[in-house]
Regions:
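Hydrophobic N-terminal alpha-helices or hydrophobic patches in metabolic proteins across all domains
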Residues: 1-162
Length: 162
């Protein structure tokens, strides 16, 4: 399964950009309150709706940061199940579909354990220090379950018309 991810936040940034889905403009939502930085490019899968009312989030393992608004054709290799103050807030872990250097990454078990721990740690603490923000959960699931969540998120969007 190949799908497009719209990048909102480049790797290494503390700025939390969000695409305004009504206007298409990219807005600076806030700067992370902690000193942590996004480990990889972060964005969302077009035409999906996750349980928190936003499009399904995706972290894209690229060797260099892109820029807000960049479209990357991706394939999913796993997903981090999480919940935040708004509800289910799962994070897809993806690679660029055409990057042969990432061809060996087909499933979550292909990613080094330490790298998964770093990513999970980021998502467990990146909202710390922010008033009225929280994050819980943090368990990895395989590519098959991640693909199923993409399909559920597409169906959810069609049902709600959101």
């Amino acid at each position: 399964m190949i799908f497009d991810v719209i990048i909102e936040i480049p790797a290494g940034s503390r700025n939390k950009y969000e695409v305004d889905h009504l206007t298409g403009e990219i807005r600076l939502d806030r700067m992370l309150f902690t000193s942590t930085r996004y480990p990889y490019d972060y964005g969302f899968v077009k035409n999906t709706l996750s349980l928190d009312g936003d499009p399904l989030d995706a972290l894209v393992m690229l060797d260099e940061p892109t820029f807000p608004g960049c479209v990357v054709s991706c394939r999913v290799i796993g997903m981090l199940n999480m919940t935040d103050e708004a509800g289910g807030d799962d994070k897809l872990l993806c690679v660029a579909a055409g990057d042969i250097r990432k061809a060996s990454l087909q499933d979550i078990t292909d990613v080094p354990e330490y790298e998964l721990s770093e990513i999970q740690h980021f998502f467990e603490v990146y909202k710390a220090l922010e008033p009225d923000k929280s994050v819980t959960g943090g368990n990895w699931v395989d590519a098959m379950e991640a693909q199923a969540e993409i399909e559920r998120s597409r169906e959810r969007l069609l049902k709600t018309g959101h």
